[in-house]
Amino acid sequence: MNILGFFQRLGRALQLPIAVLPVAALLLRFGQPDLLNVAFIAQAGGAIFDNLALIFAIGVASSWSKDSAGAAALAGAVGYFVLTKAMVTINPEINMGVLAGIITGLVGGAAYNRWSDIKLPDFLSFFGGKRFVPIATGFFCLVLAAIFGYVWPPVQHAIHAGGEWIVSAGALGSGIFGFINRLLIPTGLHQVLNTIAWFQIGEFTNAAGTVFHGDINRFYAGDGTAGMFMSGFFPIMMFGLPGAALAMYFAAPKERRPMVGGMLLSVAVTAFLTGVTEPLEFLFMFLAPLLYLLHALLTGISLFVATLLGIHAGFSFSAGAIDYALMYNLPAASQNVWMLLVMGVIFFAIYFVVFSLVIRMFNLKTPGREDKEDEIVTEEANSNTEEGLTQLATNYIAAVGGTDNLKAIDACITRLRLTVADSARVNDTMCKRLGASGVVKLNKQTIQVIVGAKAESIGDAMKKVVARGPVAAASAEATPATAAPVAKPQAVPNAVSIAELVSPITGDVVALDQVPDEAFASKAVGDGVAVKPTDKIVVSPAAGTIVKIFNTNHAFCLETEKGAEIVVHMGIDTVALEGKGFKRLVEEGAQVSAGQPILEMDLDYLNANARSMISPVVCSNIDDFSGLIIKAQGHIVAGQTPLYEIKK
């Protein structure tokens, strides 16, 4: 494993112990005198912070092991006790903090991966296999204790001096941290930097004589000087990035805003409430790197200004509105936090103006502004089912070069972190067709595939697929073609009509280019028109044969007597509803007449749960004919109103 790959994997392993912090902070906060004033609740939260290094040892060991094993977690705990207790007998001043937990966790996880299947002689067989792992870890950590007892004091001094320099640098130090923090997001290494800043740098001793290290620990212990590595994130995550999302919405052409609006709104609300910004950042990180660089600079400026103004705020998870409300009046620690709201309004305006100007000035390809020839056709796949997820995982394995090229699989919140033999063999286009928003090739062996919130599920499914046997790489011929716009065929004068369709749906006509799905809107699926339904019955638009009804009953394909293939697709992304809201009234292979009922819908349910109920009705093989003539407009009635005419 190369150095970059190691630190990427370490960043993933750190997420498990960090995930317990919100619970600890909630308990500690609600137990305070100004809220519930219940000491045992506060102590419960404090206990987690007091034993954070041990929690890191357990969490890192489990995450580093090949199958998240409990034996590895136990080994991490054993190693931690051996290392910390043995080391101080050599030098009582040694205090490794969470770094001791991280190191022993790595030793425990590595020992498990190496020796969990070890076979010992019969008289020692009880101690073989997984039972051997804590024993081996304890031995190795004893050796480390003997080494670190002499080696660590100068390292500890260097870390302390570096931390003191950053703290003494004040606003400049926090600004540099904020800038580098955002720059490391694409590589995933920000978790390593955060761990040092939030759990190691700085020292605070409370009235009881307990020593706390790191910005988060010191903040929740009541250190009024803590927060320089946290405060400035609140204006960015709660206000700045939502301002960027609004700018990207208005920068998109008007006809495409409905397609990107829902997505931008959801990621902006997520950033505001929880401080989880990666889904929003990844929308422009790869499409417009210049914007991401400006975002990193603005983040650094925000941390710089917050420190300069004497603002001291903290969080347990991230800088969202939920954490802001919890820490707003935390005794002794929170100071001037109201100013973050003022900063937030200012940064909202800055992000909106800067993003708006830069996007238009440099014609950046933010969501909704992509060139038609760059848009990728995405297949409709239901990854909510086990079968669908397995197929998606198999496709991703093929896209990255097959099992021969794939060496290691890991995942975090939004990314598949993959180690490959040769990143040049990765099919970026196929990855994007499968739903990835970007592929990052960090070096020849390390890549990241940005797949969104289902990254961990997809990663787990990929591991299961690999365990079952080899998967071939996707062939060059299998590379999906980009969705070049399909020119609308023009009906030849005096051409013969081969099909006159009636509307299959009662509702209001919507032009095809207004459908909130690029595959339909670009006419890549076929030409036709769409309808926003107002009645529950879907009928056949012409006489012919039902050649296909999707198993989720949300769409069907009709072949007319003259060979026109008509696709009636009820709603957008309704496949994700797994058939709920739809009932088929005929079966595949049925001979039907125009106006015969095919599907019945629960419109109340569908309108509440579907992304959109705008329903395309297209001729998928329109290239076989001279064109079509749209006849419908306004409000139309199923089985009665002429929809369009196909000409030979």
Swiss-Prot record:
Stored SUPFAM superfamilies: Duplicated hybrid motif, Glucose permease domain IIB
Site (Important for phospho-donor activity) location in chain: 554
Gene Ontology CC annotation, any one: plasma membrane
Catalytic residues of the enzyme: 412, 569
Pfam families with a match to the protein in the record: PTS_EIIA_1, PTS_EIIB, PTS_EIIC
KW Transport (keyword) present: yes
Gene Ontology biological-process entries: DNA damage response; N-acetylglucosamine transport; peptidoglycan turnover; phosphoenolpyruvate-dependent sugar phosphotransferase system
Cofactor: Zn(2+)
Record-annotated PTS EIIB type-1 domain positions: 390-472
Induction: Induced by N-acetylglucosamine-6-phosphate and repressed by NagC.
Record membrane topology: Multi-pass membrane protein
Chief site of localization: membrane
UniProt modified residues of type N-formylmethionine: 1
Span of domain PTS EIIC type-1: 1-371
Modified residues (Phosphocysteine): 412
Stored PROSITE patterns: PTS_EIIA_TYPE_1, PTS_EIIA_TYPE_1_HIS, PTS_EIIB_TYPE_1, PTS_EIIB_TYPE_1_CYS, PTS_EIIC_TYPE_1
Residue numbers binding Zn(2+): 554, 569
UniProt subcellular location: Cell inner membrane
E.C. number: 2.7.1.193
Activity modulation notes: P-chloromercuribenzoate inhibits the accumulation of both N-acetyl-D-glucosamine and antibiotic streptozotocin (2-deoxy-2-(3-methyl-3-nitrosoureido)-D-glucopyranose). N-acetyl-D-glucosamine is a competitive inhibitor for the uptake of streptozotocin.
GO molecular function, one term: protein-N(PI)-phosphohistidine-sugar phosphotransferase activity
Maturation and modification: 60% of isolated protein was N-formylated.
Entry function: The phosphoenolpyruvate-dependent sugar phosphotransferase system (sugar PTS), a major carbohydrate active transport system, catalyzes the phosphorylation of incoming sugar substrates concomitantly with their translocation across the cell membrane. This system is involved in N-acetylglucosamine transport. It can also transport and phosphorylate the antibiotic streptozotocin. Could play a significant role in the recycling of peptidoglycan.
Entry-linked NCBIfam families: EIIB_glc (TIGR00826), PRK10255.1 (NF007608), PTBA (TIGR00830), PTS-II-BC-nag (TIGR01998)
UniProt remark on domains: The PTS EIIC type-1 domain forms the PTS system translocation channel and contains the specific substrate-binding site. The PTS EIIB type-1 domain is phosphorylated by phospho-EIIA on a cysteinyl residue. Then, it transfers the phosphoryl group to the sugar substrate concomitantly with the sugar uptake processed by the PTS EIIC type-1 domain.
Protein name, UniProt field: PTS system N-acetylglucosamine-specific EIICBA component
Organism: Escherichia coli (strain K12)
Lineage: Bacteria, Pseudomonadati, Pseudomonadota, Gammaproteobacteria, Enterobacterales
Gene name, Swiss-Prot/TrEMBL: nagE
